[in-house]
Amino acid sequence: LYDIDPQRLEESHLMLTALNNNLGNKARIETYCGVENRRAALRGANYAVNAIQVGFYDPCTITDFEVPKKYGLRQTIADTLGIGGIFRALRTIPVMMDFARDMEDVCPDAWFLNYTNPMAMLTGAMQRYTGIKTVGLCHSVQVCAESLLKTVGMPYEEDNVRAKIAGINHMAWLLEITDRNGNDLYPEIKRRAAQLTEKHDNMVRLEIMKRFGYYVTESSEHNAEYLPFFIKDKYPELIDRFNIPLDEYPRRCVQQIADWEKRRDELTRNPSLA
């Protein structure tokens, strides 16, 4: 485990230690704090999992929203592309390059698994300008089929659903969705989607599925920014029609920070954590 924040590092260590204890103590967990110890943390690694945020929510994420808004540019998430994504990339790419330089020296054959946004910009920078093998990942792939089925009122059982997903980092397509017997679920999904009348959180994604034939992995908030069809200053009625939550990410961050502070002690002191 590596972090530049000793408190966050200790919290992560406590939780992983509890998990390890409850799963048979099969892992050896070591911690490294501070930039001066980064090379030691990476030395000999086969994989490096990256999940960082440069600049924190306050002030940087706030700035990513407030500056564009001042000039009439509205956003929902602002962590992948557009003005907010560019801001985030400009402050994060230099840190990623530092990671890469260290990895080239102490673990040149390791895979860099990136969970940090802006996904495409950061992964692209690593692939173009470093010698480190890099893959961009997002948890949306794991929950894609479940979110679609629940949106249209169909049951989701992990053991009964098969999904084939492909695409670029942070923007992939659900190419196939079947039950365990190979029956295509898309026809029934699309039939039910066409009958929905109440507003819901997946309206942008269902509109994309209607137009292109396939469901996308990323949320409606993300896709409202990815495509130039939804957030239009000349057509503000689209915001309401597709239930697009402008300024969603700052609200989400505030709630997540509050939830984390509330749950932190419970998690780190829970002897049955697994």
Task: Please identify what each model-predicted range represents.
Residues 153-274:
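Long, compositionally biased stretches enriched for glycine and/or charged residues
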